[in-house]
Amino acid sequence: MDMILRPGRLEDADACGRIVFEAFKSIASQHNFPLDIPSAEIGIRLVTRMLSHPGFYSLIAEMDGTVVGSLFLDESGPIAAVDPLTVDPAMQNQSIGRRLMLAALERVAERRFAGLRLVQSAYHYRSLCLCAKLGFVAREPLSKMDGAPLEIKFPGYDVRPALVGDLAACSALCRRVHGHDRGGELQDAVSQGTARVVEHLGAVTAYATDIAFFAHAVAQSNQGLKALIGAASSFGGGGFLLPTRNGELFSWALQQGLRLVHQMNLMTTGLYNEPAGAYLPSVAY
């Protein structure tokens, strides 16, 4: 069967969402890990949101008129992110994932993004090896953490909802830590009411689009991240990602009763700066 790649359409949401669920379910079940996408309905909602968002580009793999895989690129910032790439488990071993990723790399080069990033499950060796062969470099081991809300406050580190007026300060903080901003994601989170900032000594010293699987946070120090994590009312998406090499923060999270769900890897091509501060990545990067 011949395969074609085409841009996604809103009417693809049902087929793509079900494949997203089945793909995550298949690999997680093989390794006896919890599902990051726990139901087809959640997969469909996720895909619908991305197909409807102007900051996302979608590629659909189709064989004989049937959707067999998809890839979504978050193009809302200077760094593009794969979020996610999935293939129908019944259609494996036909290089579908490879062709989708090659097409994504070609688009990133054509659109002159500074780089392309992704986060993949550490137990998914096939994904890890494919990405490495295509030029991605493993940069950071990540720990997905989950548990009950901590309800912890830190004197002098005040957490409040982020406002439109905070966007410039938050983006400047992100540029200091990462060398680029994530303004598109941040603006969406402010509009949705999920973003939070930490004020310390009269200045914004940390922000989070949420403390969740699909969200990121940036801070001058671990204390800002602890304040954001401590104030979170829940950890959406089955938990949040924490750089495992941040030993102080990882140890603190465990001491507060949070548990390790599984390990993931941050992988990059193109621009990458070693972070000059504290951060929590999203499942995109």
Regions found by a protein language model. Give the residues of each.
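Short, structured interface segments
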Residues: 128-152
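A short, well-structured alpha-helix characteristic of acyl/acetyltransferase catalytic modules
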Residues: 10-32, 152-154, 164-173, 275-282
